[in-house]
Design a protein with these regions (language model features):
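Mid-sequence, gly/pro-rich, charge-dense loop/helix-turn segments that line enzyme active sites
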Residues: 72-176
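Structural motif
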Residues: 62-64
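A C-terminal functional module that forms or caps the active site or interfaces directly
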Residues: 159-215
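Short glycine-/acidic-enriched loop or helix-start segments at secondary-structure transitions
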Residues: 7-10, 74-75, 92-93, 212
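N-terminal short beta-loop-beta anion/metal-coordinating cradle
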Residues: 1-58
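Active-site-proximal beta-strand elements of phosphoester/diester hydrolases
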Residues: 35-40, 153-157, 203
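His/Asp/Glu-rich mid-to-C-terminal helical/loop segments that flank catalytic regions of hydrolases
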Residues: 210-241
Length: 241
């Protein structure tokens, strides 16, 4: 959601707004690092356009995709953070021409995140969790959402579907058992970065359990938790650069 990056945009100084293709790109600096912040919009197609514009129009050298996701793996809980190792499109199926989930003409199912950028993101999140989640979101939000976040690294699946049933969750896990969480954009952005040879990583805050219990107050969670997580994580990444 657009609100997920409001606080990240607030970090920028020397801001300039550029509008292209019904998208708003906020150009500026976080600390001494030149940055461009944009809302990807929902779904793989929209995110592909946004990522391509970031690379082609703004010449970004690294791309960090941050937002929320639904948990698939057992044990993940609301407020946990997942950083990608690999990304896969769970709704991609061009059989019998190629294998299920395979990216056409790329001869691969998974796209790997950049190891150095992923390590940097992990260090940033670890630093923040060591200081305590209440420093990111405040004590009231910690109580309201029962936050006790854990950091995970692993596979993230993307598709043009909101997963909110046990049947769909179990179907994805049966075919892709290593996937930790599911969302709607990351793997498409990963493909763009792969083809343009731009290092990337994906950081996701778990907002729901992607099953029949997925009906949560997203607006409240986005404003009080995800937005604050994003600001803190991006700010800490920049501090570590």
């Amino acid at each position: 959601m657009a609100q997920e990056i409001d606080e990240v945009k607030a970090l920028l100084t020397e801001k300039t707004i550029v509008k292209i293709a019904n998208r708003e790109f906020v150009v500026g600096k976080i600390g001494n690092v030149r940055c461009v912040v944009a809302f990807s919009k929902w779904g793989k197609g929209a995110a592909t356009i946004t990522a391509t514009l970031l690379i082609q129009e703004f010449a970004v050298t690294d791309l960090i995709f941050i937002g929320t996701a639904g948990a698939l793996a057992d044990g993940l809980k609301v407020g946990d953070i997942v950083i990608s190792k690999r990304l896969v499109q769970h709704d991609l199926d061009a059989r019998p021409i190629i294998s299920r989930f395979e990216l056409p003409l790329l001869n691969r199912i998974y796209v790997n995140s950049d190891p150095e950028l992923t390590e940097l993101a992990g260090k940033a999140v670890s630093n923040l969790l060591e200081r305590g989640v209440e420093h990111m979101v405040g004590e009231e939000a910690v109580k309201d959402f029962n936050l006790a976040p854990t950091l995970y690294f692993g596979d993230i699946a993307s598709g043009d579907q909101f997963i909110n049933s046990d049947a769909k969750r179990n179907e994805i896990l049966k075919l892709l058992p290593d996937v930790l969480c599911v969302e709607m954009e990351g793997a498409a952005v990963a493909q763009v970065c792969l083809e343009f040879n731009v290092p990337f990583t994906v950081i996701r805050t778990i907002s729901d359990t992607a099953d029949h219990n997925a009906r949560v107050d997203f607006g409240k969670f986005i404003v009080e938790v995800a937005n604050a997580y994003s600001r803190a994580i991006i700010g800490e990444i920049v501090r570590l650069v």
